[in-house]
Curated annotation (Swiss-Prot):
GO MF annotations, alphabetized: metallocarboxypeptidase activity
Enzyme Commission (EC) number: 3.4.17.2
Protein name according to UniProt: Carboxypeptidase B
Keyword Protease annotated: yes
Natural source organism: Protopterus aethiopicus
Recorded GO CC terms: extracellular region
GO biological process, one term: proteolysis
Subcellular location: Secreted
Entry similarity comment: Belongs to the peptidase M14 family.
Comment on bound cofactor: Binds 1 zinc ion per subunit.
Prosegment residue ranges: 1-15
Membrane-crossing residue ranges in chain numbering: none
Keywords, in A-Z order: Carboxypeptidase, Hydrolase, Metalloprotease, Protease, Secreted, Zinc, Zymogen
Length: 15
């Protein structure tokens, strides 16, 4: 399940 994480002010979905 991909978890939404904030990176550099952008939301990136990583598994």
């Amino acid at each position: 399940e991909p978890t939404p994480r904030s990176f550099n002010g952008d939301k990136v979905f990583r598994v």
